[in-house]
Amino acid sequence: VDYCKIKCLKGGVHTACKYGTSTKPNCGNMVVKSYGVTQAEKQEILKIHNDFRNKVARGLETRGNPGPQPPAKNMNNLVWNNELANIAQIWASQCKYGHDTCKDTTKYNVGQNIAVSSSTAAVYENVGNLVKAWENEVKDFNPTISWEQNEFKKIGHYTQMVWAKTKEIGCGSIKYVDNNWYTHYLVCNYGPAGNFGNQEVYERK
């Protein structure tokens, strides 16, 4: 794929064009401990997503503002996509916290969740806890109004996590030391993107 030719819905130069297709870290003088998602981490990320999607779909999520969350009838089971993961890793490997603009593939308009955790103790936060922080945003979600009427910065990771029409996920991760802060940065890309237009998070049962 020539990523320099991909025109993203949100515009901008594609991450895999701008930074090249290497996933090697490009973090200036920060000390990189490791980068990439291990097989175990990949399975954990997928399991947390699918268990949670299943829980919400079955109407078993009692949290919310107000709760509970209504059940869903069209929730896809997520599968891992290596291309999404690769593009997520290229971005994570820049050690720049934030969303990259253009990360679409020829197959998908791509959505994204990011998380970072830093500690002065020489330990790196477990990937599962980073993902669960997105899940916990459900506590602020009001299902009686549309997701667009909710306060996006409080619920946007949750809505992408359970966006029914999303089919595939791929994540990248990097662990580095920045001024004695032991930092774990996780980027997950989703296709097709959630939090999109005037669509609903999921169809209610």
Curated annotation (Swiss-Prot):
The keyword Secreted applies. Pfam families: CAP. GO terms for cellular component: extracellular region. Keywords: Allergen, Disulfide bond, Secreted. SMART domains: SCP (SM00198). InterPro entries: Allrgn_V5/Tpx1_CS, CAP_dom, CAP_sf, CRISP-related, V5_allergen-like. Disulfide bonds join 4-17, 8-102, 27-95, 171-188. Residues 46-190 form the SCP domain. Belongs to the CRISP family. Venom allergen 5-like subfamily. This is Venom allergen 5. It comes from Vespula squamosa.
